[in-house]
From Swiss-Prot:
Residues 138-375 form the Radical SAM core domain. PANTHER family: RIBOSOMAL PROTEIN S12 METHYLTHIOTRANSFERASE RIMO (PTHR43837), RIBOSOMAL PROTEIN US12 METHYLTHIOTRANSFERASE RIMO (PTHR43837:SF1). Belongs to the methylthiotransferase family. RimO subfamily. It comes from Thiobacillus denitrificans (strain ATCC 25259 / T1). The gene is rimO. GO terms for cellular component: cytosol. One of its GO terms (biological process) is tRNA modification. Its cofactor is [4Fe-4S] cluster. This is Ribosomal protein uS12 methylthiotransferase RimO. It catalyses: L-aspartate(89)-[ribosomal protein uS12]-hydrogen + (sulfur carrier)-SH + AH2 + 2 S-adenosyl-L-methionine = 3-methylsulfanyl-L-aspartate(89)-[ribosomal protein uS12]-hydrogen + (sulfur carrier)-H + 5'-deoxyadenosine + L-methionine + A + S-adenosyl-L-homocysteine + 2 H(+). [4Fe-4S] cluster 1 binds at residues 20, 56, 85. It is found in: Cytoplasm. Keywords: 4Fe-4S, Cytoplasm, Iron, Iron-sulfur, Metal-binding, S-adenosyl-L-methionine, Transferase.
């Protein structure tokens, strides 16, 4: 139990962060503000005067995980503030957990702080030097997510993000660059650019110029990527919608300004299914563009995600998807079974695919891609590549190459290599590979 003396000395907040990297950035902003106001951040329910839970509500499994996390926090602590995507469904949260102190939606910093102030009065004398230059981060010190916008203008039939996070709102480019500079100054070696639709950055403000370094810079993905690349850190683009404008960043990759890595969620390859999803459907043009990108940047890594078992997906259409994988030769791929999400338009589509068939298709999809990924990694044996050290374990050092985003891609194992600090960059020679990872030796 928290004593009055402890509360008077340093009010403490526990934090649970769930969901995607965009939610992680929201959590980091809340944590930074809490520290700026003098609150202590603790890692256990017992030590916390109040607990903030930043939720995810994108799919049913995420909703359930969030509700369970809220329930655990209530059981272990009792004073719980809920925010995040599931917070947009406040009635559901209060129905399941009526004891929560407050509920707010995503990117609701002011509302969260108001709720914290109501439950736990603001400390009298916070110190500015409690805040690291790059703010409070939930990631290791050597990499950080950089969120450049909120919301999305697309209305994909399987997605409810716009109803939770609203339409696209781009952050001012000067603000983004100042944050990036602070992160790099604090030791960050890799900036992972995230948003719901990175390639649409600036569309909402008609690409109007902002200011950074005393000069005007357009609020647009290409100009942002070029400016970020000038800071000296790795720059990795995530969640890039397959617009023609993607072609404009390929020269920056060829010139080494940003990493030769694109995370583009293609979702499917059947034109009919893509139309039902309300996604771009020119598959042949997509393959042509992939080949053109690789011709310009041979070391380009392509990551994508797909959905199998979408309502109405036939056997021939699933075979189209497998054929696309074989022609596209993507490096990293994630795949999900279609799951009905409350509020999604796709729920109303006819001919749902049976769960057993979804499972079978998912297995075949992953088997097909595993062979492709293994072959592409096997082709790297004997090459020298640059890696970034993440951590050390009892076997050696774990690092990542340009082709590996943290947590979702593979790693490069440096067995028997010790003493390298996280964030160190070095050149290694690839000795072995499997379908996911590489083994290498420092050069």
């Amino acid at each position: 139990m928290v004593t009055k003396a402890k509360t008077a000395r340093t009010p403490t907040v526990g934090f649970v962060s769930l969901g995607c990297p965009k939610a992680t950035v929201d959590s980091e902003r809340i944590l930074t503000q809490l520290r700026a106001e003098g609150y202590g951040i603790v890692g256990s329910y017992d030590d916390a005067d109040v607990v903030v839970v930043n939720t995810c509500g994108f799919i049913d499994a995420a909703v359930q995980e969030s509700l369970e996390a809220i329930g655990e926090a209530i059981a272990e602590n009792g004073k719980v503030i809920v925010t995040g995507c599931l917070g947009a469904k406040g009635e559901l949260i209060r129905e399941v957990h009526p004891k929560v102190l407050a509920v707010s939606g995503p990117h609701a910093l002011d509302e969260v702080m108001e709720a914290v102030h109501g439950a736990l009065p603001k400390p009298h004398d916070p110190f500015a030097d409690l805040i690291p230059p790059g703010g409070i981060k939930l990631t290791p010190r050597h990499y950080a997510y950089l969120k450049i916008s909120e919301g999305c203008n697309h209305r994909c039939s399987f997605c409810i993000i716009p109803s939770m996070r609203g339409d696209l709102v781009s952050r001012p480019i000067g603000e983004v660059m100042h944050e990036a500079e602070a992160l790099v100054s604090a030791g960050v070696q890799e900036l992972l650019v995230v948003s719901q639709d990175t390639s649409a950055y600036g569309v909402d403000v008609k690409y109007r110029p902002g200011f950074w370094g005393g000069r005007p810079v357009k609020t647009r993905m290409t100009e942002l990527a070029r400016a970020l690349g000038s800071l000296g850190a790795w720059v990795r683009l995530h969640y890039v919608y397959p617009y023609p404008s993607v072609d404009d960043v390929i020269p920056l990759m060829a010139d080494g300004v940003i990493l030769p890595y694109l995370d583009i969620p293609f979702q499917h390859a059947s034109p009919r299914i893509l139309k039902l999803m309300k996604r771009p459907g020119a598959v042949e043009k997509t393959l042509d563009r992939i080949h053109a990108w690789r011709a310009a940047v041979p070391e380009l890594t392509l990551r994508s995600t797909f959905i199998v078992g979408f309502p109405g997906e036939t056997d021939p259409e699933f075979e189209e998807l497998l054929d696309f994988l074989k022609h596209a030769q993507l490096d990293r791929v994630g795949c999900f079974k279609y799951s009905p999400i409350e509020g999604a338009v796709a729920n109303e589509l006819p001919d749902p695919v049976p769960e057993e068939l979804k499972d079978e298709r998912l297995e075949r999809f992953m088997e097909t891609q595993a062979e492709i990924s293994a072959a592409r990694l096997d082709a790297k044996i004997g090459r020298t590549i640059e890696v970034l050290v993440d951590e050390e374990d009892e076997v050696g050092t774990l690092a990542r190459s340009h082709a590996d985003a943290p947590e979702i891609d593979g790693v490069v194992y440096l067995e028997g290599v010790f003493g390298l600090k996280p964030g160190t960059r070095l050149t290694v020679k690839v000795d072995e590979a499997d379908a996911h990872d590489l083994w290498a030796t420092p050069v």
